[in-house]
């Protein structure tokens, strides 16, 4: 199961969440990971001794209870209640850290962080962060682009011209997200987010030209850090026989399953004389229309059927 260290969580969110170390530095390598019986959103929560979260957040009410615990009002000791499995404790709302909590975290190698932010906002940000960071992932071969604000993954065998097609689309004002190895993360039940590894970011390999830095050539707007995957365009090599066998009036919706998420897909035959950049743009525009409930093929078939009925009626009404 995917997991991250407390150290990475701190480094990624230190400035955004105003985090600071208070104790337990030796536990910086503690792991925070998805459990089989718990969703990612359940990893973070207010201090809970019955159903402990991996990340325990101390807010106003929890801080007041800990102060009572430390003063002996409750009849319990820290060790009695804190004998639970947890990876990290965060004291929010800019509250002071009680000496008892600091000592317990130090002795048990549990990282203790503080934040000046309110606990509900802190937990919301951490849940979104963990949902993205710990998402199930896969790597697909292809080129991932932002075309008309739609995340489009172009796939196909090597040598079909995916990179050249991507370069043409970028020159027409669209944006590159990832080339060659597209990292896909399931950030929601029906949502895949495509990203590029830091090593390959900004680069596009084109046969004959080598490695191109798209950001330097086309400017900042030619690159996007991530995008929701909505459409897959699969390039296939086609000859005359293949083109003859195509169903030109198909109304079936093709999908491809990635990480148990169905993504709309379109197959584009690659043949001499076909302008693939224009075809990709047309496919994306058609997809946008279908999202709005407009299907050109179905509309044509309905119009054709209406015309046939009108002709049939006209023939019946015509005198012999």
From Swiss-Prot:
Its cofactor is Mg(2+). Its EC number is 2.7.11.-, 2.7.4.-. Residues 204-213 are annotated as: Important for the catalytic mechanism of both phosphorylation and dephosphorylation. SUPFAM superfamilies: HprK N-terminal domain-like (SSF75138), PEP carboxykinase-like (SSF53795). It catalyses: [HPr protein]-L-serine + ATP = [HPr protein]-O-phospho-L-serine + ADP + H(+); [HPr protein]-O-phospho-L-serine + phosphate + H(+) = [HPr protein]-L-serine + diphosphate. Pfam families: Hpr_kinase_C, Hpr_kinase_N. It is an enzyme of class 2 (transferase). ATP binds at residues 156-163. GO terms for biological process: regulation of carbohydrate metabolic process. One of its GO terms (molecular function) is phosphorelay sensor kinase activity. Mg(2+) binds at residues 163, 205. Gene3D superfamilies: HprK N-terminal domain-like, P-loop containing nucleotide triphosphate hydrolases. One of its GO terms (cellular component) is cytosol. Residues 269-274 are annotated as: Important for the catalytic mechanism of dephosphorylation. Catalyzes the ATP- as well as the pyrophosphate-dependent phosphorylation of a specific serine residue in HPr, a phosphocarrier protein of the phosphoenolpyruvate-dependent sugar phosphotransferase system (PTS). HprK/P also catalyzes the pyrophosphate-producing, inorganic phosphate-dependent dephosphorylation (phosphorolysis) of seryl-phosphorylated HPr (P-Ser-HPr). Both phosphorylation and phosphorolysis are carried out by the same active site and suggest a common mechanism for both reactions. Homohexamer. Belongs to the HPrK/P family. The Walker A ATP-binding motif also binds Pi and PPi. This is HPr kinase/phosphorylase. The lineage of its organism: Bacteria, Pseudomonadati, Pseudomonadota, Betaproteobacteria, Neisseriales.
């Amino acid at each position: 199961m995917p997991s991250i260290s407390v150290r990475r969580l701190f480094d990624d969110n230190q400035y955004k969440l105003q985090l600071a170390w208070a104790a337990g530095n030796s536990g910086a390598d503690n792991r925070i990971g998805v459990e089989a019986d718990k969703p990612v959103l359940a990893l973070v929560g207010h201090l809970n001794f019955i159903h402990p979260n991996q990340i325990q957040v101390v807010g106003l009410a929890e801080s007041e209870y800990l102060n009572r615990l430390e003063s002996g009002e409750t009849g319990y000791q820290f060790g009695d209640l804190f004998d639970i499995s947890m990876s990290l404790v965060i004291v929010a709302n800019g509250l002071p850290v009680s000496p008892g909590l600091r000592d317990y975290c130090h002795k048990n190698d549990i990282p203790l962080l503080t934040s000046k932010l309110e606990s509900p906002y802190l937990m919301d940000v951490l849940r979104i962060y963990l949902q993205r960071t710990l998402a199930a992932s896969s790597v697909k071969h292809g080129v991932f682009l932002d075309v008309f604000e739609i995340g489009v993954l172009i796939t196909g065998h090597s040598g079909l011209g995916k990179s050249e097609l991507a370069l043409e689309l970028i020159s027409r004002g669209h944006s590159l997200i990832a080339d060659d190895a597209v990292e896909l993360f399931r950030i929601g039940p029906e949502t895949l987010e495509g990203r590029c590894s830091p090593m390959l970011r900004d680069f596009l390999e084109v046969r004959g030209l080598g490695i191109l830095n798209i950001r330097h050539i086309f400017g900042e707007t030619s690159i996007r850090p991530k995008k929701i995957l909505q459409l897959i365009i699969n390039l296939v090599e086609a000859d005359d026989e293949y083109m003859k066998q195509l169903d030109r009036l198909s109304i079936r919706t093709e999908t491809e399953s990635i990480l148990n998420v169905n993504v709309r897909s379109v197959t584009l035959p690659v043949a001499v004389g076909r302008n693939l950049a224009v075809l990709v743009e047309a496919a994306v525009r058609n997809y946008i229309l279908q999202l709005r409930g407009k299907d050109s093929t179905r509309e044509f078939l309905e119009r054709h059927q209406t015309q046939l009925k009108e002709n049939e009626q006209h023939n019946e009404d015509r005198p012999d």
